[in-house]
Amino acid sequence: MAGCRLWVSLLLAAALACLATALWPWPQYIQTSHRRYTLYPNNFQFRYHAGSAAQAGCVVLDEAFRRYRSLLFGSGSWPRPSFSKKQQPLGKNILMVSVVTAECNEFPNLESVENYTLTINDDQCLLSSETVWGALRGLETFSQLVWKSAEGTFFINKTKITDFPRFPHRGILLDTSRHYLPLSSILNTLDVMAYNKFNVFHWHLVDDSSFPYESFTFPELTRKGSFNPVTHIYTAQDVKEVIEYARLRGIRVLAEFDTPGHTLSWGAGVPGLLTPCYSGSRLSGTYGPVNPSLNSTYDFMSTFFLEISSVFPDFYLHLGGDEVDFTCWKSNPNIQAFMKKKGFTDYKQLESFYIQTLLDIVSDYDKGYVVWQEVFDNKVKVRPDTIIQVWREEMPVQYMKEIEAITQAGFRALLSAPWYLNRVKYGPDWKEMYKVEPLAFRGTPAQKALVIGGEACMWGEYVDSTNLVPRLWPRAGAIAERLWSSNLTTNMDFAFKRLSHFRCELLRRGIQAQPISVGYCEQEFEHT
């Protein structure tokens, strides 16, 4: 195995040496050479292949063609470059794009195929894929292959790439409750996610701190639960824009509404929803988690999640279920009476009762669900297709042991525990995130097939729009490559060179990505 890895490392290093630009994330299979072709910005075109199922009018690809032309060449005109005989023009200055299945008006899903093949040689410049989602990934790779000489001439090397993701779920979580993130910050994040081939935006919309989601069924939730009901909310149009913006980049929107804990912001808008806490025999004036003993709680949840199910088109909703503090439930005599009536002797049983009822409600709306690991740990009865997200890194249960237990029980798993980007420390902390191997647990091949990917999490206690971008990028890129590329792509020196280059490319694209070491970029951020 060591010899195999050394050979792979040498091969990758050789590939990097003959590429004028480095790719991020690294593709599964690549052949490239020093032979290069000139591109002319003034007449370069993206064009549909005659045999493609998608043609002009396919909004996903039409919009992508416009975006990538701008990313490559900008909006100005360029003088025609002079070139020697060794610099061969690239065909007719056209990238032909061919897809087998046109899904132009659909949404990406967990089963979407993102494979693509990119061929650049003397005879053709062709991007082939089974779906438009694969074509989007190939367009990003193509954009990273194009490079500009010191004289201002655009080139691309002779290249053959066959590429596909290692995991189908590659996400970023943004917390928009603890600090409100303007719509522009979310859209900007979606752009850079596409550059990194992420495909899931996990939107942690609400929490204890605020309820910025504008509910049309329960408008008081937003009016009384947001930081500011005018300036710090996401309107129905905002949510719709995020979903469509993400779709055009091949990104799913996984909405999270976490209950029964993390719900203090819900209380003012829905009287009676939260549990009143007691101090001795008297009400303390404070509130705890959702009250699981009242029928009105489940009536509300049924109506509310009917709305959510209609607003968010993805098959999956994230229902949370983490960090439920039992202190308030323990203090409340009505909760104690309810538990006695039900025969519950443990507050985890009460929590399980609530969550099981909620899961049944959501299932009735033909939705699947993702939950945090506590739902599994507390032995809540869930459907076999439930996805469990692992976030707890601390002992006594190390996260790989947790994944082993989850997959042994037959459930699919997502890994987030080692990828909390809101946590920062001095130095190149991206390296530790890059070194994580999601399948490094004892398990059968069938178990390991149940790990469907992971997410980088950006919790918002100390993050808002002022520091979101440099804290996310390019650090999140380490997770992007770990979830996309082969498990053999692990050489740290090779990764460092490519990530440094990619960080400079992000600056060129107007993204204020932080440095990963000492150095410089030809085009610094203030020059964009």
UniProtKB/Swiss-Prot annotation:
Is Hydrolase set as a keyword in this record? yes
Example GO biological process: lysosome organization
Any keyword Ribosomal protein? no
Query: Signal peptide location in the record?
Result: 1-22
User: What catalytic activity is recorded?
Assistant: Hydrolysis of terminal non-reducing N-acetyl-D-hexosamine residues in N-acetyl-beta-D-hexosaminides; N-acetyl-beta-D-galactosaminyl-(1->4)-beta-D-3-sulfogalactosyl-(1->4)-beta-D-glucosyl-(1<->1')-ceramide + H2O = a beta-D-3-sulfogalactosyl-(1->4)-beta-D-glucosyl-(1<->1')-ceramide + N-acetyl-beta-D-galactosamine; a ganglioside GM2 (d18:1(4E)) + H2O = a ganglioside GM3 (d18:1(4E)) + N-acetyl-beta-D-galactosamine; a ganglioside GM2 + H2O = a ganglioside GM3 + N-acetyl-beta-D-galactosamine
- Kindly list the GO CC terms recorded for this protein: azurophil granule; beta-N-acetylhexosaminidase complex; lysosome; membrane
Q: Which InterPro entries match?
A: Beta_hexosaminidase_sua/sub, Glyco_hydro_20_cat, Glycoside_hydrolase_SF, Hex-like_dom2, HEX_eukaryotic_N
Among CDD domains, the record links this protein to: GH20_HexA_HexB-like
Critical for hydrolysis GM2 gangliosides, as annotated region = 422-423
Q: Which segments cross the bilayer?
A: none
Q: Which residues are glycosylated?
A: 115, 157, 295, 487
Q: Which UniProt keywords apply?
A: Disulfide bond, Glycoprotein, Glycosidase, Hydrolase, Lipid metabolism, Lysosome, Signal, Zymogen
Q: Which residues form the propeptide in this entry?
A: 23-88
Q: What is its main location?
A: other
Q: How is its activity regulated?
A: Addition of GM2A stimulates the hydrolysis of sulfated glycosphingolipid SM2 and the ganglioside GM2.
* Places the protein is found: Lysosome
Q: Name one GO molecular function term.
A: protein heterodimerization activity
What EC number(s) is this enzyme filed under?
3.2.1.52
Regarding protein family, the annotation reads: Belongs to the glycosyl hydrolase 20 family.
PANTHER family per the UniProt record, alphabetical: BETA-HEXOSAMINIDASE (PTHR22600), BETA-HEXOSAMINIDASE SUBUNIT ALPHA (PTHR22600:SF39)
Report what the protein is called: Beta-hexosaminidase subunit alpha
Q: Report the source organism.
A: Rattus norvegicus
Gene transcribed to yield this protein: Hexa
